[in-house]
Structures are given as C-alpha cells and as structure tokens.
Regions:
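Nucleotide-sugar donor-binding patch of glycosyltransferase catalytic domains
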Residues: 75-137
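Donor-binding and catalytic core of enzymes assembling or modifying cell-surface/extracellular glycoconjugates
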Residues: 2-89
C-alpha cells in the first residue's frame, strides 16, 4: 500500500541518507505526488511517467536499489543486476520462487506476505527496512 511504502522510505532514511526516486506509470502519477508530499522531509523526487521503455530502462539503470511490487520493472532491474527488493502477496500464483529476478542472489531480497489479505504486507516495516539496509545497503 502507499502507506507501507511511505513507512518503508521513512525507516530506510533513518538508517542511511539516500535520495528516493518514485517511478510509476501514468495511472499512479498522482499517488506518487501525494506520497512525495507526505515524505517532504526526505530527499525525494517523482519521475514524470512517459510511454518510453528506453526512458524507464535508463531510470532503472541509474538507481542503486530498486524496490517494487510490480514484477515487470523489477525484472528489468534484475536483468541489469541492480539490487532489488520485491514484495509478493500471499497467493499461490505470486510466490517469489515463481517470479524471482535473475540478478545475483546477493543483490536481491524478497518478502512474501504471510496474511490472507493480499492488499498489504503484514510484516513489520521497521524490520524490513533494517533487513534491506543490512543485506543490500551497508
């Protein structure tokens, strides 16, 4: 959910000083602007979406860490061997085993929801942020 990503950015910012860039499709642009406003104390930008795949690939290639709930852009990041963090809902058809990225194992983390409601990640966001920091950003 938006709130989970906001909490994750806040918790990661407590651990390290990174610039956050929100990248989205045209349908989620307003949501990203709202998230940016809620995260105004952080160093954060929103990339205006285009329909240009080359632009999306370029944006992903420039990042240090790519966090996504959507496997399409996540697989692009994985194919570039970027550090990736994936979130998978608690559905038989959406497991990390099935949809894992092809980047080096040391460059990827995946979190699967353990709840029955597939809308939100049920894990502790503070713990996830610490895990991301310890395994991918330290």
């Amino acid at each position: 959910s938006e709130d989970d990503f906001i909490k994750l950015c806040i918790e990661l910012d407590k651990l390290c000083s990174y610039k956050f860039i929100l990248h989205c499709d045209i349908y989620d642009y307003e949501k990203c602007l709202t998230m940016k406003n809620k995260l105004s104390k952080l160093d954060i930008d929103v990339i205006k979406p285009t329909n240009q795949l080359i632009q999306m690939f370029s944006n992903i290639n420039q990042c240090d860490l790519f966090i996504a709930g959507s496997t399409g852009p996540l697989h692009v990041a994985g194919s570039l061997n970027k550090k990736t963090v994936a979130f998978y809902p608690s559905k038989k058809s959406s497991t990390s085993l099935r949809w894992t990225t092809i980047n080096d194992k040391s460059n990827r983390l995946a979190y699967e929801d353990s709840g029955t409601d597939d809308k939100y990640i049920k894990k502790d966001i503070r713990w996830i942020a610490k895990d991301i920091y310890d395994k991918l950003l330290k």
